[in-house]
Amino acid sequence: MSSGATPAAVKIGIIGGTGLDDPEILEGRTEKYVDTPFGKPSDALVLGKIKNVDCVLLARHGRQHTIMPSKVNYQANIWALKEEGCTHVIVTTACGSLKEEIQPGDIIIIDQFIDRTTRRLQTFYDGNHSCARGVCHIPMAEPFCPKTREVLIETAKKLGLRCHSKGTMITIEGPRFSSRAESIMFQTWGADVINMTTVPEVVLAKEAGICYASIAMATDYDCWKEHEEAVSVDRVLKTLKENANKAKSLLLTTIPQIGSMEWSETLHNMKKMAQFSVLLPRH
């Protein structure tokens, strides 16, 4: 960026997962119901600020948790945040651990994913919307924004949180949990944690040219571990209740830091990548 140029303004979208979508983190909250070319997002957008940084919070499963993972309108959620001017999206997600060293209550700033979903639209460029013409072949070697991840990792260290600085998330279709055979297979594939929502959310954010990062909260050991209680809804909710403040404090401390940083080059590169990944129809 040339000297004297105005730094890029940032606006942070926050997508809250199960038990991690508390709107109280925002100051001066207002609600905004929107529609998109892809339908309605999961719930109202909650607009507000965290230490003077503009933020938009969206409950991934709806505020009453009525939307199962396969039915979340991921296209509408990301499109709505993009249209609201979000430059970044930081999400929270509950997950199961596939590694002994990733304990329930730990935070993982994931850097890779494996997709085991089967029923989800993974692109805006589906041939049905004039707002997204062409075919998009978005690069996915680095799915998550490295710069945003680095801020989250450094902030977690300063807060004294048990945080793993990388991890591969395997996303399953759900809503059922894995069988033991599947859980063990996923370990052999190199997955560290497992959830039901990272894909296609991260893919769509990349298509939208948004800096996307995820705060994953381990709630259980899935079902691979012998002599350990297998994952259940009760166990997930219990661990989230005991540890949700960790994700909350990480968001509240990281977002002002992001707001104070220079993002012009990063945002330019994200938008350029998204733009040049689209093949337009020949005329």
Curated annotation (Swiss-Prot):
Feature type site, description Important for substrate specificity: S178, V233
Catalytic activities: S-methyl-5'-thioadenosine + phosphate = 5-(methylsulfanyl)-alpha-D-ribose 1-phosphate + adenine
Annotated positions binding phosphate: T18, R60, H61, T93, A94, T197
Molecular functions per Gene Ontology: S-methyl-5-thioadenosine phosphorylase activity
EC number in record: 2.4.2.28
Binding positions for substrate per the UniProt entry: M196, D220, Y221, D222
Gene3D superfamilies tied to this protein: Nucleoside phosphorylase domain
Location of this chain's protein in the cell: Cytoplasm; Nucleus
Statement: the UniProt record of this protein carries the keyword Hydrolase: no
Presence of keyword Repeat: no
Top-rank taxon: Eukaryota
Modified residues (N6-acetyllysine): K51
Pathway named in the protein's UniProt entry: Amino-acid biosynthesis; L-methionine biosynthesis via salvage pathway; S-methyl-5-thio-alpha-D-ribose 1-phosphate from S-methyl-5'-thioadenosine (phosphorylase route): step 1/1
Pfam families cross-referenced by the UniProt entry: PNP_UDP_1
CDD domains: MTAP_SsMTAPII_like_MTIP (cd09010)
Keywords, comma-separated and alphabetical: Acetylation, Cytoplasm, Glycosyltransferase, Nucleus, Purine salvage, Transferase
Family: Belongs to the PNP/MTAP phosphorylase family. MTAP subfamily.
PANTHER family recorded: S-METHYL-5'-THIOADENOSINE PHOSPHORYLASE (PTHR42679:SF2)
Function: Catalyzes the reversible phosphorylation of S-methyl-5'-thioadenosine (MTA) to adenine and 5-methylthioribose-1-phosphate. Involved in the breakdown of MTA, a major by-product of polyamine biosynthesis. Responsible for the first step in the methionine salvage pathway after MTA has been generated from S-adenosylmethionine. Has broad substrate specificity with 6-aminopurine nucleosides as preferred substrates.
Oligomeric form and interacting partners: Homotrimer.
Protein name: S-methyl-5'-thioadenosine phosphorylase
Organism: Bos taurus (Bovine)
Gene: MTAP
